[in-house]
Amino acid sequence: MGKTLYEKVWEAHEVRKLKNGQSQLFIDLHLLHEVTSPQAFGMLKDLGLRVRYPHRTFATVDHIVPTHDRTEPFQDPLAQSMLEALRANTREHGITFFDLGSGNQGIVHVIGPQLGLTQPGMTIACGDSHTSTHGAFGAVAFGIGTSQVRDVLATQTLAAQKLKVRRINVEGRLAPGVYAKDVILHIIRHLGVKGGLGYAYEYGGSAVEAMDMESRMTLCNMSIEGGARIGYVNPDETTFQYLEGRPYVPKGSEWEEAKRRWLAWRSDPDASYDDVVTFRAEEIAPTVTWGITPGQAIPIDGRIPLLEELPEEERPVAEEALAYMGFRPGQPIKGVPIQVAFIGSCTNARLSDLREVARYLKGHKVKKGVRALVVPGSEWVARKAEEEGIAEVFREAGFEWRMPGCSMCLAMNPDRLEGDELCASSSNRNYKGRMGSPRGRTVLMSPLMVAAAAVAGEIADAREVFGLAGVR
């Protein structure tokens, strides 16, 4: 019987089985940021321990950094202290740190792949829930807590429970104006925010195989919103084309050997799965959320569900969502006014995201009264976008072009909603208060849909705003 990629990677990295049913796994790559690492380093110091393998550990600053004015000290003294702590800890332990202005600073899940640190067959850990992003390369990537960050720093291992594997096939061809963000929202809408509990998700099928790497990253990024701890795609030629020539990947003859080695991680044709689910790409439309979980999503031309249409166990959360969002059952989502538009986050702030939006945004203007921000995922992305004229397209349209960071995705920096503002967002979470205001509202969608909402001043169909029919 064949094995899945997940099983192969697990077995190759299993140091030992633990008495509690978990396994101790060797971690190939440990990524750090400023929020979940200070306490971990503090615990390490209290125990009198050093970082076990500094050369397998890399750090950046992303969550707390201002994206408008980076003059130090920051206005927020806590943010400044977290940055200073990361600088001191990485310096003390000999860890590579991509600091502000280094040319490689950015959102941790953007810079890992961008630098070629993320590679097929790896086990990867980071103190951030969206570490599943790296699974797009055929890696098994764990989002971990602070005490586990300490464990990996000290031992380069992680205690973990082996998961079941669900294969999610997306077959067919996506229509113009439909992107990976729509695919993952569609999947979560149908499988639920708890549907992936206890599972690793393996994404495949012709639509996934046709995706570029940055689209696959979007898909894997939001596995966690569907309840799965792990999401991955089998490595292929698309993976190799993306990785070739990046700073941390093998070069020359070692590159050819690496590709042969990486292909061996692919799930075997006769691998057995605990569950298989198939979706048709042609049935997926531009999708947006209407509530307070990513699973509360509908096609752009749909209506918010009537309570009686929902399973009984979903009705209390739906009622809570309707009250919080100020929506009513049966209401069309299209046409709802927005006050803020945000393109950014570890889900959708890569160069391909910005290129695609700029392609259609050129010649359009942000609606008066809408505050629109675009926040590149890294200094490299920002630099390339400037070189290609992408940044200027956004500026001309009326978007604020910001510096890299997590920005509005979470309320840990100055980019926040005010009052009950409604934000059309390319991020990954629409929880109550997620964007800083206890009454702020978030509607998740693809970057192009965010741009369409910014131009229209309301939630809109990008295919109509930008005339996408028959394009691509």
Swiss-Prot record:
The keyword Magnesium does not apply. Pfam families: Aconitase. It comes from the Bacteria. Belongs to the aconitase/IPM isomerase family. LeuC type 1 subfamily. Disulfide bonds: none annotated. One of its GO terms (biological process) is L-leucine biosynthetic process. Binds 1 [4Fe-4S] cluster per subunit. GO terms for molecular function: 3-isopropylmalate dehydratase activity; 4 iron, 4 sulfur cluster binding; metal ion binding. Gene3D superfamilies: Aconitase, domain 3. This is 3-isopropylmalate dehydratase large subunit.
